[in-house]
Amino acid sequence: MSVTATIRIQQADFDVAQEIAALSKGRTDVGAVVSFSGICRGSENGEPIAALTLEHYPGMAEAEIGRHADEALSRWPLQGLTIIHRFGRIAPGENIVLVVTASAHRQAAFEAAEFLMDYLKTNAPFWKREESEKGTSWVEAHDHDDAAAARWTKS
């Protein structure tokens, strides 16, 4: 059975439980479902955050995420894959991103989800701006995020 990833880039929030259920309900070939949901924090380094604004390059973002989803599907035996990433102004407590992987066994589901999140955190064409009492500032990837993503590079 050929698996196609579900990829959505949207402004609206999403229901994590509903997305997980949609991927796994009634499936007898799925033995493991792993999900990661990224949520907007209300503070960074002790400083309150009013909101995040995520910008993306339409078309390019979908294509790049699709390319990495295809790589995950070729590297791990997945029965299902959903990636949702929001853009626009996001308030603390709201969802930002969701990755759900389904496989017959847990190792493939965990590794594929981690691979995809490491990519999304470091190289996906999204730009994040924090709003705080001090003003706005662009958020850069951290060194530890780059190191996590580098471990998936094929030699």
Protein language model regions, located:
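N-terminal, polar/charged subdomain of small-to-medium soluble alpha/beta proteins
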Residues: 1-96, 110-114, 118-155
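Short glycine-rich or small-residue beta-strand-to-loop segments that form or flank ligand, phosphate
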Residues: 96-103
